[in-house]
Amino acid sequence: MALKKYNPTTPGQRQLVMVDRSALYKGKPVKTLTEGKHSNGGRNNTGRITVRFRGGGHKKTYRLVDFKRTKVDVPAKVERLEYDPNRTAFIALIKYEDGEQAYILAPQRLAVGDTVIAGAYVDVKPGNVMPLGNMPIGTIVHNVELKIGKGGQIARSAGTYAQLVGRDHDYVIMRLNSGEQRLVHGRCTATIGAVSNPDHMNISIGKAGRTRWLGWRPHNRGVVMNPIDHPHGGGEGRTSGGRHPVTPWGKPTKGKKTRSNKSTDKFILISRHKRKKK
């Protein structure tokens, strides 16, 4: 879908660039495939802020998206493409031959009326699901499982994809958007194609108020705070913080390695940080 610019009637309109969603369904979602979504304002169950600068925003209904696609060898027809406020990608409503409906992530080049299917050996076309071990090398996929049967976890945002670049015994080698290459078990499933809405990366929010509609509050820098609020705070007049950049909790930021999960290091063949070292 194309980008949409607006007449500069106000400063916010002048800067605004949005994705043209005129081709999407304009009605309400299927009620049986939705549930209420409680806004927590960045607080956890004890009421403490765990994510700063969250709060407000438009009320949303959560769409139950099927990331597992366990209904195998049953064709489904794409009924319509919809906007989902809970994610950057678009979603597709599919209807199986037995009458069951489900929401899935809409891949690029999926159109209303197309047929999708999940199975061990299916056609390599957008929206179909099959185990990674049965796919030809070079296939572009999204919604990739990391654990067998857990459901897709990799490449779910707008425009993202992973590519199958090789095989190694029971595993396949996947190249991710970040440049990382990692091993994934061949029995893990993935959906063929890249995720829809690739133009999401080119949008311009236009004004601060639109960010508030999305549930984000103003972000304050540490150097403008008081010493009680941030390690960079305080000082007479404007200061640079007086130390190497740290988080509000005193941990080094801007490049310090924080990964501690050594048990899965063996699955990462090429780190996503390798390109930065060149």
From Swiss-Prot:
Q: Which domain of life is it from?
A: Bacteria
| Pfam families listed in its UniProt record | Ribosomal_L2, Ribosomal_L2_C
Gene Ontology, cellular component aspect = large ribosomal subunit
Query: Which SMART domains does this chain map to?
Result: Ribosomal_L2 (SM01383), Ribosomal_L2_C (SM01382)
Keywords from the UniProt entry = Ribonucleoprotein, Ribosomal protein, RNA-binding, rRNA-binding
**Gene encoding this polypeptide?**
rplB
Give the family this protein belongs to, as stated in its UniProt record. Answer: Belongs to the universal ribosomal protein uL2 family.
Q: Where is this region: Disordered?
A: 226-278
Any idea which GO molecular function terms this record carries? rRNA binding; structural constituent of ribosome; transferase activity
Question: The organism's lineage?
Answer: Bacteria, Pseudomonadati, Pseudomonadota, Alphaproteobacteria, Hyphomicrobiales
Q: How does it assemble?
A: Part of the 50S ribosomal subunit. Forms a bridge to the 30S subunit in the 70S ribosome.
Q: What is this protein called?
A: Large ribosomal subunit protein uL2
- This chain's source organism reads Rhodopseudomonas palustris (strain HaA2)
